[in-house]
Amino acid sequence: MIKARIRSQCENSNLGDYEKVYRSFSWEKFSEQLVKDQTGRIDLVGSAIDLWADNPETADQVALIVEKAGEIRRFSYQDLQEISCQWANMLSGLGYCSGDRLFVLLPQGPEIYFAMLACARLGVVFCILHSKADFAQLEACLLNGKPKGILTHPDYLERLPAEALTSVRHFLLTQGPPVATSGHEVVINEIITSLPKRCDPKFHSPKTPLYIVYTSGSTGPPKGVVHSHGDSVGIKASAYYALDLHPGDILWTDGDPGWVTGTVYSSFAPWLCGASSVVQAEPFSASTWYRTLERHKINVWYTSPMILRKLVAAGEDLPGRYDFSKLRHIASVGEPLTPELFFWCRNNLNHPPHDTWWMSETGMILVANFCTMDIKLTSIGRPLPGVETAVVDENGEPLNFLTMGELAVRPNWPAMASGLWQDRERYEDYFRREGWFLTGDMAVTDEDGYIYLQGRNDDLIKVEDKFIGPYEVEQIIARHPSVSEAAVISRTSVEGPVTMKAFVTVHSDIPPSSRLNLEIKAYVKANLSPDIPLKEVEFMDELPKTSTGKLVRRALRAKELGLPAGDTMNMTD
């Protein structure tokens, strides 16, 4: 744990005084801002799109900007209202109604967002599949979700596993002619323009399923996490406080819509706040990312340490060539920020990055370094107003600060997953300690309530009579001037106590050597504790990670045992 404290320089934020807002907060403040009927049912698209489209002062405001293949397309709130109604009318005409499921397998593009809005209007449950998902991943998701339709591109049809398509009645194609003719293809462009641009508002219970997002199961098949229309209350509150979104802001969330961050914070979150969303569909390059920040005058950028590391690798000369004067706030998600990334970002992009924490099951940001709060390096911040967290022991009892336990949340926030699709037992396991949602993340809190993650509960390393989280050891190793990244696991032996093994990648100009191996071990003992049982260091070309940049330590443990890595839903190719 690093004691350094970075003073906040944020002005005119939505949050203001954190302590005051946290004490007096009520979810009702944000619930009242949604479009509802007299029974309390929600019109999510009415709240996110129609509210602005029907107001002459905001109807022409840009809501969605998509940059793809050298072309920039802009859609106003009125455009999205009309297009989403046409898509809803198309789906309704094909027989889709509340509870049906539409899966989406597309590269980044506006059609993903048209489909999300159309489904939300009708109560159809959407699921955005990652465009790079492999055959086995697609098969697992399709067999579990049993969609009525799949929205895709003709080039993707042959990637779909035939055995998993028995429930599918329609293949909705973004262009034609189809590469195969099964009699179930519908070419959207051939029918959409003739459909009405208006549709009647539809209200749904807060408990009506909105979308499914598939995430990896460390010990089983992918989990289909179900979220509902009532999430909109928490989504808006988190975007308002954690991302500090104002009406008219331009937000760029650079996560793929196949991951929950992209699903939530590139669509409904900015629109519920009256902001614009930027979608960059080009492959990553540092110049493309910098150009996007400059060209689209981004005010709020929601990114990840994985992206920041790539920018660091591209060098410090590039940022100075671009104008970031419109950028006001940078937020990060996926893993805790290292001090090195924090200071690089602050020094080269002129703004400190603010960590956020949440997971697919929480549906919204729950913990953040809010822009009005001082930042403590390596801390993910403090709970969002309205969210109660604690670090608890194995019995669910809250622990004192600076004592490691499992991060838990009182299950009263409005975006909590309503279930796991077709898997009630695994869902109920999150609540196995009465009164708490157990996150699986190990953490400690300090005297000011800041939270520090220590790894997943199955990543903990038991040394003599205490548990050690791998994250702190990895951070120390990563500070060695020759090291790029590190991952740490435990090793057991019948001959003696538990020890640690580190997997390390070094900078491109540094050759691995036995001398460096010894140096790293000594560095950890000197900078953390002489009792740390780091017995082995193995150099690797790259570490196994999810596509959002998280280390997959179980893959390293499996490697040590000569076993398969398990489900790879979220791992890179």
Annotate each PLM feature.
Residues 60-117, 134-139, 187-190, 229-230:
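Conserved AMP-binding/adenylate-forming core of the ANL superfamily
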Residues 60-62, 172, 178, 192-214, ...:
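Conserved pre-ATP/AMP-binding loop-to-beta segment of ANL
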Residues 74-78, 210-234:
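Conserved AMP-binding A3 loop
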Residues 133, 143, 150-153, 301, ...:
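AMP-binding/adenylate-forming catalytic core of the ANL superfamily
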Residues 187-189, 272, 298-303, 313-375, ...:
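Gly/Ser/Thr-rich phosphate-binding loop
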Residues 233-250, 257-300, 314:
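Conserved AMP-binding/adenylation subdomain of ANL enzymes
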Residues 383-386, 397-430, 466-468:
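Conserved ATP/PPi-binding loop(s) of AMP-dependent carboxylate-activating enzymes
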Residues 526-551, 567-573:
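AMP-binding/adenylate-forming catalytic domain of the ANL superfamily
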